[in-house]
Amino acid sequence: IPGRTGRARAAVSVPPPAGEQVPTERLEPRVEERAGGYWVLKEKYRAGLNPQEKVKLEKEPMALFMEGGIQDLARVPMEQIDAAKLTKDDVDVRLKWLGLFHRRKHQYGRFMMRLKLPNGVTTSEQTRYLASVIEAYGADGCADVTTRQNWQIRGVTLPDVPAILDGLRAVGLTSLQSGMDNVRNPVGNPLAGVDPHEIVDTRPYTNLLSSYVTNNSQGNPTITNLPRKWNVCVIGSHDLYEHPHINDLAYMPAVKDGEFGFNLLVGGFISPKRWAEALPLDAWVAGDDVVPVCKAILEAYRDLGSRGNRQKTRMMWLIDELGMEVFRSEVEKRMPNGVLERAAPEDLVDKRWERRDYLGVHPQKQEGLSYVGLHVPVGRLQAADMFELARLADEYGTGELRLTVEQNIVLPNVSNERLDALLAEPLLQEQRLSPRPSMLLRGLVACTGNQFCGQAIIETKARALQVAREVEKRVAVPRPVRMHWTGCPNSCGQVQVADIGFMGCLTKDSDGKIVEAADIFVGGRVGSDSHLADVYRKSVPCKDLVPIVADLLVERFGAVPREREEDEE
């Protein structure tokens, strides 16, 4: 972590401007600490709660981890679990605090397990272990790279969970607090420490944040009863690979009075009913205070956030209700010394920077070494792929892999003398994990879709690949175009940040038949000129998408129609 390079400074806070009035009673914390360190909603605030809050009140979710409940639950047959509401809610809701998501609708009795992987950094040993877990489940087992630089593994059965958790601990991993109303995986620069142009190495900060959030994988019940999920990122590059504008808290590197630290953005999020870009908190913290300010913001959100309508419980709704200055004041009084400094005049991100493509071969800051970005088609991997990736990381690098928010993988620290041998490896030659994908495939992102997810309305991963490949037969695309797919309005595929986005829905076709369809979004941008996409067309049947997308690429993105053979349809 960069040291303090400036003079010693007294912490000074500027009083908030007058005019924003919030009733005193509204600022009373709505939660209180109970035995075991758990934070519970006060009795007088329990009217009008959403169903998820009622489940949390009925039984503390973290008890499944901190009090050994998972070991007992894993011994109970699913049929017996379903016979009682309490244990059924354990399986369908509370296990999400352990990163376990029951796929009741599509894979009854099987779970998706989401990990914590700060900055997307993983090792060959960890990758092999995860591969061994999904391999045991045969056709039901696979892994996905997520849009938060993370692993999700599929096919897990409940009786296996205690042993899997032990295996994760043995290789330095955890799945704790990775679902529901918790802090999600801390995102950082996927090229941290190897990027010749990085502003700061984000890994120390994301590791600190993750250690705080999970209490070093022991469980941190002080922040496990948030009103809703909460996303955080640390910016380390001019490219803004970390997507600060859609995070609840984004640390923007900035120098104030000669001292390195971060300006703060807050409130960015995507949801079914609303999506909003993060706004300046008008606050700066020194590099040493990354965790204290995160803690203060989380506690303000935990204490004051609404727990009624689930669609209005993300942190930005609280900021809107209180006003930014009052929200800032609530954060400030939860800081260790009761002071939160005003922002530096500007951050260190170059607003004229053209975002770089990390796929392919690129020189590192370390002489004689390169990193190789590999495209993972819609983020889906099988056990054999992961075993091979682990081997490549050991044989050509330093046993390390980096996951990206675009669902791809970076292999760092490859000696330049070994690049040709790496690029000749069958896994890369077969186009399975290509360093040189086509213009449309390289920017393709897709959520899980209805193959596994009960909330998804349409199938996404196979369809995303099919549409991209069919469109490429019709038009030549001169530059990468980021196309994102999400199976439902929850937008796990982040369609609002895409050049072209597809959000799953249902509609009637020309024959009056209900068919899978998509709302099309256009105009999302990432980088310093970030902008969330707007709806372009609603309820387009999926079978009609290819010509529409091809025309859109010609009209908006400089694509050129290809010549067709006479016998081509």
Curated annotation (Swiss-Prot):
GO terms for cellular component: chloroplast. Gene3D superfamilies: 3.90.480.20, Sulfite Reductase Hemoprotein, domain 1 (3.30.413.10). Pathway: Nitrogen metabolism; nitrate reduction (assimilation). Keywords: 4Fe-4S, Chloroplast, Electron transport, Heme, Iron, Iron-sulfur, Metal-binding, Nitrate assimilation, Oxidoreductase, Plastid, Transit peptide, Transport. It is found in: Plastid, Chloroplast. Its cofactor is siroheme; [4Fe-4S] cluster. It holds the Pfam family NIR_SIR_ferr. PANTHER family: FERREDOXIN--NITRITE REDUCTASE, CHLOROPLASTIC. This is Ferredoxin--nitrite reductase, chloroplastic.
